Structure formats: structure tokens, C-alpha cells
């Protein structure tokens, strides 16, 4: 039986997309996938339609390693409208309460300090978390509120930028699973006036360089430029991609000699010198250090395969 024909290119890497405002993360993903003519694509944690900023798009084999970015920390710039609370905690929702803004600078500083460090957060009903197999926002749209457990998060840094009139601007560096909308809603309640997000931009994800972020408009311009020069668009698009193992850049590297990597790629744990005592590792092979997958140190100190790169014949 012949192997089914694959649709699109076998292109592997990560594009750091600057998601535009008003577009869902999935719509942005599909546009990038079409521009690159990629056979597979996936993002690494959705941004709300209102939000802009860094959305890493994994193409091809890089989709296998996107899960490691979900665990990474992120940095945001947010502007809150004080005195109004909405049902979604952002400007896309309906105003449900209005109150005067009467807090002092000292009260604001004290309230902000309660959100720094290790805290617990109850996720918004307007989130993609699931309850009994159904997303929370699906319940919310039906007017149903379901129980949610508080989840531990870490706010590594919360910077006060400005407070002018009924606007408050902050910069937040936080752990995975943090809902900025919920921080703003909770802050508004602490201040006694209510608040919601009117602007949100993701500035950074993990250690990705911010100067490598690109817009959809720039991608389209490169496609047009390639057509004018009568060259494949891939020649201009592909250099924009980060390496496919970049989602796992926080993990140590173990390099296997080619004699051992053959066994590893066939699903077998292997012994090698220089491996850590435990945990996940990025596995490369040979003198050129080609990435071949993720491994984990097993109980016998061997490198056991966890996620492998598949090389498709041309």
C-alpha cells in the first residue's frame, strides 16, 4: 500500500508572528500556514483577539515540540480602563458595573504589590480551560457559571508604567497559565472601582529575540517580492524561521555519536557520556549537532527517546 501524499511543504521551524489586533490566534495560524504552504502548523498558546504581539507559530516537525513553549514564561504590556468592569474582563465584553475611581497612589502601590511573586488565580469564565470536557467560554456564552479551582502562578515582575485619568498601564512578566485579564479584574476589585483590559500586547515568550518578530504584512510583501524576482517564495520566507528545537531551548543538549543515534532514532534508550543525571534533554547527533528529538534520562542513566524528528523523503 503506497504512502498517502502529503499536502504542502515539509518545512520545519518556528515563526515569531506579530499577531494583529482583532484576529484570532487560529486565524493567524492558518494565514501563516498558507503563506508558507506548510503541511502542518500549530501555535504555542493563544492570544485573545484583542491582544497583539508575539505568537510563535510552529511549522512541520516543530509542532512536536510546541508543548515546551506552553511551559515558558511570558511578558506583557497592558492598559486597563478603571471604573468599569466587563463580563469578559476586556473591552470586547459588555459593561456590567461602573464605579468611581477614588483610590490614592499609596493604595494603588499596595494593591499592585499583592500581585507580585507566587499567587493563586481563579481563571476567567471566558477562557479556553475545560470543565467536564467543555470549554469555559462555551458555558459563559450560555450564561452558565461553573466552579473553577484557583491555580498557582508566579508574577516575576510587575512594573508600574503610568496612571493617567482612568487609565492604568503596567508591564507584567509572568509564568505559564497566567491570565492578564484576570489580574486586571482582580486588581480593579482590590481598588474598589473595577477595571478591564483595553490594550494588551505580548512582548516576549521565553528567550526568543524580540527583533525576530514579523508581521503578516511583511510576509505578504516577501511573497510579492519573490514573484517579481521570479524566485521561489521559500528563499525569502524560510530564513525568517527559528530552529525547530528552539521551543525547547531551556533544556540541556546531549550529543550522540552516529553509532548511538541510530539506536535512539529507532526508539531505544542509549548510554552516553556527559548526560545530566535526570530530566529532559535536547538530543543532537554527529559533529554537526543535528537535532533529532527530545529525550529523558531514565532510571538507569540512559537517554530514552520521548519525541523524535521524522525525516520525510523528498
Swiss-Prot record:
Enzyme Commission number: 5.4.99.25
Name by which UniProt lists this protein: tRNA pseudouridine synthase B
CDD domains (alphabetical): PseudoU_synth_EcTruB, PUA_TruB_bacterial
Superkingdom of origin organism: Bacteria
GO biological process: mRNA pseudouridine synthesis; tRNA pseudouridine synthesis
Catalytic site: 48 (nucleophile)
Family the UniProt entry places it in: Belongs to the pseudouridine synthase TruB family. Type 1 subfamily.
Catalytic activity: uridine(55) in tRNA = pseudouridine(55) in tRNA
Keywords: Isomerase, tRNA processing
GO MF entry, a single one: tRNA pseudouridine(55) synthase activity
Organism: Shigella flexneri
Pfam short name (any one): TruB_N
Name of encoding gene: truB
Residues the record lists as binding substrate: 43, 76, 179, 200
